[in-house]
Amino acid sequence: MYQDLIRSELNEAAQTLNNFLADEANILAIQQAAQLLAASFKADGKVLSCGNGGSHCDAMHFAEELTGRYRENRPGYPAIAISDPSHLSCVSNDFGYDYVFSRYVEAVGREGDVLLGISTSGNSGNIIRAIEAARAKGMKVITLTGKDGGKMAGSADVEIRVPHFGYADRIQEIHIKAIHIMIQLIEKEMASV
């Protein structure tokens, strides 16, 4: 009954992945992001991750697999997803939703830390403010974006951009794969300490 729709969805996902994979810059960006994160961890830094909606879930997923585990048992790495409901609701109420991530970065971000900002459009105002706050703190910035990178294009030390202009779920599918590969590479980098 829905087999054609299922095949179509899987084919579109595969095509989006193949398009991403065809650009060597994307492969290098994932590698550079993982190396930047591992260097921060080796220097006693941490990563703060943030996103909205499904990207918020990806930010939490990323932090959880760094502090917990990915595939193998190993020491946890210092990762915090900016997701505390009391912080988010307080800042949203008192300052506005555009400040929910930047206020947290201002409070706990330090020079040598890394911010991972995730936005499929690249236009999320609260992620842009978090990037600005991270820069003011001397932090490095990695972004996961989509389409043309939006307003976030060019704002990161490392940008992993999925150049898909359709629905956001295709971009998110590549983001989660990039996240998993980054964690795998971080583990390899940290094992060489």
From Swiss-Prot:
Gene of this entry: gmhA
GO cellular component terms given for this protein: cytoplasm
HAMAP family on file: GmhA (MF_00067)
Location in or out of the cell: Cytoplasm
Primary enzyme class: isomerase
Protein name per its UniProtKB record: Phosphoheptose isomerase
Annotated PANTHER family: PHOSPHOHEPTOSE ISOMERASE, SEDOHEPTULOSE 7-PHOSPHATE ISOMERASE / DNAA INITIATOR-ASSOCIATING FACTOR FOR REPLICATION INITIATION
Any Pfam family the entry gives: SIS_2
Residue ranges constituting the SIS domain according to the UniProt record: 37-193
Subunit structure comment from the entry: Homotetramer.
Cofactor requirements of the protein: Zn(2+)
Job description of the protein: Catalyzes the isomerization of sedoheptulose 7-phosphate in D-glycero-D-manno-heptose 7-phosphate.
Binding positions for substrate per the UniProt entry: N52, G53, G54, E65, N93, D94, S119, T120, S121, S124, Q172
Family under the similarity heading: Belongs to the SIS family. GmhA subfamily.
Note from the entry: The reaction produces a racemic mixture of D-glycero-alpha-D-manno-heptose 7-phosphate and D-glycero-beta-D-manno-heptose 7-phosphate.
PROSITE patterns the UniProt entry points to: SIS
Co-factor binding details: Binds 1 zinc ion per subunit.
Pathways involved: Carbohydrate biosynthesis; D-glycero-D-manno-heptose 7-phosphate biosynthesis; D-glycero-alpha-D-manno-heptose 7-phosphate and D-glycero-beta-D-manno-heptose 7-phosphate from sedoheptulose 7-phosphate: step 1/1
Source species: Edwardsiella ictaluri (strain 93-146)
One example of a Gene Ontology biological process annotation: D-glycero-D-manno-heptose 7-phosphate biosynthetic process
Catalytic activity: 2 D-sedoheptulose 7-phosphate = D-glycero-alpha-D-manno-heptose 7-phosphate + D-glycero-beta-D-manno-heptose 7-phosphate
